[in-house]
């Protein structure tokens, strides 16, 4: 029996990503922009009801909740050909429409005001599921709504549904060129909630997305649409084994359990290959896609969707490759042997050094130019360099108490700035834990003789 997942899209970024993701899911399941199953979509074998449910008139509706504090992006969705796909009762735009002013504290306070409206939608979706497995949250952590309101909702979802999984797709800001001056504050405050209240966080680093888009598309500055197509391809591929199930990894808990051996280190990187013009406008083609070729490309640092600082000690904690297409399992076995012989992947010294592979069939309704494609979900210690970058940027602002007044206007910061210090400490502990994973005695980390209690 399929276990349903409710998607919560927050803010400008979350709703832009979500809109393209649902277009992609509709295409992969033979569902029209109005939610009607196409006459030619007769293949079966897919599980639509993990992410969709059927209305009384049989058309398919995403199990999605769209929330924003300003109306522009949701208005665009409602003016698009997919306007009738969504349940109008599951769309929330703040009445004053003023947004969160790129301020985490404003977004968080807005959460307290609109909590009941949003929770009513979430409860309705949860109750409409036969066997809810969990939530997927799409957001950015740089601005106000995705980071602040996102933080508030993560806390509440965790309180209200303690046994349900929460997987986030979180866009981290581009370190080089952020358009929000206070993004180091917003990001760190949101990161604390991602550490404490999410079971798994797929890290999408804007800097890396821009670099991969530029590399694949031959353009200096890729458009928002192109970057969102990139992201939606990755999100759709990461849910492929839930929608086209095989023997393993056919529910969220199976995927998370195989990737996250210790609870705090749950920040995952992704690589995908090949990106082609089927998915992204103007993508250059890759001629050859054997299983070995795809698996080798997935391990190349330049294909990772997180910009990390190279380090000799960095290593994989776990890898899950989701390979799509008509693939012979012997090819997979041979490819894994070749990768091991050439030592293309460096693993932690205290755990199993193996690449897990999930084979999944591809949607019969989407034609592609390539035989095999692959997504890698990896837990890698070099993600610590992303947290280090965030800490350094935060410290630079905090040292001067720059822009603090904007935060003090909100209730949470009215009596002091402990929340900032607490968020910084959480990030620092996370950084230390990922670094500790690189040493053989990590197993005693956090014990009486370890670094933390």
Curated annotation (Swiss-Prot):
One of its GO terms (molecular function) is GTP binding. The keyword Coiled coil does not apply. Keywords: Cytoplasm, Cytoskeleton, GTP-binding, Microtubule, Nucleotide-binding. GTP binds at residues 142-148. Gene3D superfamilies: Helix hairpin bin, Tubulin/FtsZ, C-terminal domain, Tubulin/FtsZ, GTPase domain. The keyword GTP-binding applies. GO terms for cellular component: cytoplasm; gamma-tubulin complex; microtubule; spindle pole body. Disulfide bonds: none annotated. Its main location: cytoplasm. One of its GO terms (biological process) is microtubule nucleation. InterPro entries: Gamma_tubulin, Tub_FtsZ_C, Tubulin, Tubulin/FtsZ-like_C, Tubulin/FtsZ_2-layer-sand-dom, Tubulin/FtsZ_GTPase_sf, Tubulin_C, Tubulin_CS. Belongs to the tubulin family. Tubulin is the major constituent of microtubules. The gamma chain is found at microtubule organizing centers (MTOC) such as the spindle poles or the centrosome, suggesting that it is involved in the minus-end nucleation of microtubule assembly. This is Tubulin gamma chain. It comes from Coprinopsis cinerea (strain Okayama-7 / 130 / ATCC MYA-4618 / FGSC 9003) (Inky cap fungus).
